[in-house]
Amino acid sequence: MNIINYYFLFLVIVLSFKSNGQVPKVYTNISLDRGNAVATVKGKEYRESNNGAGFHLQDLIGNPQGTQTGVKFNFGPKVPSGKVYFGLINPTDGKYPMPVYFRRTAKISASVTEINLIQLRGKYDMSGWEKSNGGFLGYRVMGPEGQLLYDGRLSFKYENDMFRVPPSIIEGPTINQLTDNSVVISMKLNKPGPIVLNVNDTKYESKGKTTIDFKISSLSPNTEYKYSLEGVVTRNYAFKTNLKKGDRTPFVFAYASDSRAGQGGGERNLYGANYYVMQRIVAYSKARNVAFLQFTGDMINGYLAEKQEMNLQYANWKRSLEPYSSSFPVYVAMGNHEALVTYFSNPETAEEFGIDRFPFETESAEAVFATNFSNPVSELKSEDGAAYDPDPKTKDFPPYDETVFSYVYGNAAVVVLNSNYWYAYALNRYPGTSGNIHAYIMDNQLEWFKDELKKYESDKDIDHVFVTLHTPFFPNGGHVTDDMWYNGKNWPRPIVAGEKVEKGIIERRDELLDAMINQSSKVRAVLTGDEHNYAKTKITEAMPRYPENWERPKLKLTRTIYQLNNGSAGAPYYAKEKTPWSDFATNFSTQNVVVLINIDGKSANIEVRNPFTEELVDALELAK
């Protein structure tokens, strides 16, 4: 893309922003100057700034074009040099075929490279592409500083002595929203084109789209279905529907969080995601025959200002789930690193803070998260209509979309919360623009949560409920200064349209605890992350939960549950810190682990394993 086209694209974005350029009423002291946000707080001006390397997903896909000898890519001006690893994928070589990388690489020069596919003939044609006149290619883009930027896929055809890149599945297929009688099979293409899906001898077709969600219904519970995708070569897959609601047949599911880029080089940082650890967690989960994996936040580095850069990091994370995500669902939730931010900075003071991007319907962290995943959708729409809503007649808050929901498998339910909704980076230090703090569940979400727990409490088919959100109720190492503790301070809370909400963070924590422990008999555990370690915390009436100077009412707990924190999926580790409840936090570990939750009728227990060594790190009976 030349500079004129880039300028035109920039102009379109700015004009689009300006045409929707009303500052949401929930914010304060923000104005727009030629499409850019400006915050003026206490006489000091902070202008919108960027934060990120500027890599975009569409650029890294590379606009592949066929040539006489292979496929040519253009990765854009942000990748002027580097190299590309590439290899064929044989779709018939096992259930979960992966790229087998060739011994040579392709050099990137002036942002352009060509993968020579002719050299993959003869003894190097391990996929039979010469016979079928086409095949599948995996490629990895390495930037000028040696960092892996993108892990790509494409299809190619060879006709009339010329290679051609047809509409190709570049992401997926993935199993989503699986129930006992339906499924959503999702995929993304490099360009619009026809896709034919066969499920149980029934054909489904999509045309003219790049993001496709095939919704398949009228399935039978606990049944394996084979499915295939027609293309250059037919690819075969399989999934198994859920147990019927109320079925008490034993099953296991997995839990983890915090897989943003780690240290150690290589795949530990596939631009924003720890591919190395995630791939092992998902492979081990599949080997243990889990029904599903719940992953709750900080998938990626995030904290970015550009949607296309966010999409790139999400794409890399989703690649780490493949090819196993073609056979079982991975449910995801937001963490603070899923933040998509409008940054404000003052160059004279080097101060910086940020808010959730707007327009909320298209640019917010919540909206972009929802476009990248296919989660269930709840009845909770937003915080509009809450007591602090500045204008009940207009939409003033971001959509919850697919960031807050619940789902059922057999006799168990999982309730997913968003503790980073409408998140304003550094709000406690820069409150002038308004926003929400890290870890705070706002009013409408709290009421929805209570209603969900009541629903499952009265449901005779549900024996076990698991609650998951990114931020611990009781942090133990890494986030003692925030999460739902803030070093024992209750004053942190959201600010809406310049006004602080009524309840502080510890008060809101107690309302959540009351709903889970005192008002529910079925919640077995709360699954959290944020802290990059594993720890099991026994939440009981005997556990110290308040600062020494606490003068407000104290919540009495009527039973015991456990907080299972597993933020060990590859982000840089945190060690254990001293807290009032330290004696109640046990089996602390900085090893990478996956929590396996075994359900067998009325009983439930956990098994915590290192997915690399398979060593048992912890075990606990949750219900007899």
Regions inferred by a protein language model and the residue ranges of each:
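Extended active-site neighborhood of metal-dependent phosphoesterases/phosphodiesterases
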Residues: 174, 224-238, 308, 312-459, ...
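Loop/turn elements at helix/coil->beta-strand transitions in domains of secreted/extracellular proteins
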Residues: 249-252, 288-293, 325-331, 409-414, ...
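Short beta-strand segments
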Residues: 255-257, 294-296, 333-334, 416-418, ...
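Short, solvent-exposed loop/turn elements at domain surfaces
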Residues: 194-196, 261-266, 340, 416, ...
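Short acidic, glycine-rich surface-loop motifs adjacent to enzyme active sites
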Residues: 295-300, 456-481
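Bacterial Sec-dependent N-terminal signal peptides
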Residues: 1-23, 516
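Divalent metal-dependent phosphoesterase catalytic cores across multiple superfamilies
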Residues: 23-401, 503-522, 533-534, 591
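Solvent-exposed loop/turn segments at secondary-structure junctions
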Residues: 259-262, 299-302, 336-340, 420-423, ...
